[in-house]
Amino acid sequence: EGFFEVAAKYYEWSGGKSFCAFDYLIQNVEYDMLASGHEPVYNDADWYDTSDPNLKASWMKFAVPLAKGHIVVSDKYANTQIMTGEVAAGVGSSAAINYYNDTVTYPDNTSEKMNLKVLPLPKTGSGEQFMPVTGTGFSAYKTTEAKAEAAAIFLRWLTEGERNLDFVVESGYMPVHDSAFEAIDGYEFPSPAHKELFSAVKTMRKEYTLTIRPEFTNYYNYVEALYPALKKLCPALQERADSGEDAALLAEETWDLFLEI
């Protein structure tokens, strides 16, 4: 709540710069739906049921500021646009913490020290909130009992309390053990930004509901078509919005694009 208002004020203050880049825009649309009390509906093609009015309602919350240029779809990962000063903020993966430079370098080759701040995901309303759990799991081939036991011992070793915290701090991942979360407050982090990240992770674990994306064969083919198409469309929409066209009508063009994916 208030996120898009801040983005609008930043756009005006900065003379037309986007406030935030989203790595996974459609996932944030989903979390808005869930927080508004609506489950996403999928079709047989592993994509969204676009006849669902709740999907469009949540999409349009993002589409209007997208059409105005207040937010953008990231260039793969938002940290790149943050490190070049293109945007002031990004919404993306916790693992991105390890891909930030110490400086922001602008297109004119001037630079300044980065003061990176990390916060929990923006919320929709005051009810139940949602967050993703994504990434890679461990698996082992069916093998001998001795090797299977060795694999299990290794996993228990890796996920033990403070060792688990050591590992996830280096990787930017989320802890998997209760004792690792309990150790966050007293842990010696490599940077203030890492400390803020894991404070945010701890807060979200307490206040947000974890969600796991359904396993769809074709889903990411749609996503990989959607984001480049949006990035191609939105600069022209931004120019038209700046020229006085109705942003709500321009946002409908992003929905038309969504329907074509």
List each model region and its residues.
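Extracytoplasmic/periplasmic solute-binding protein
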Residues: G2-W47, V87
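Glycine-centered hinge/linker elements that transmit conformational signals in sensory
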Residues: F4-Y11, N43-D75, L121
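Short helices/loops that flank or line small-molecule/ion binding pockets
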Residues: E5-K9, K76-G90, K232-P235
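Active-site-proximal beta-strand/loop segments in catalytic clefts of secreted hydrolases
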Residues: D23-L25, S93-S94, L119-T124
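Short, solvent-exposed loop/beta-turn-alpha elements that line the ligand-binding surface or hinge
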Residues: H38-A57, T105-T110, K123-Q129, E188-F189
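Extracytoplasmic/periplasmic substrate-recognition and gating elements
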Residues: A67-K68, Y106-S179
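Paired acidic/hydrophobic, glycine-rich loop segments that form the ligand-binding mouth/hinge
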Residues: A88-S93, Y99
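Conserved C-terminal helix/tail region of periplasmic/extracytoplasmic solute-binding proteins
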Residues: F189-P192, E196-I261
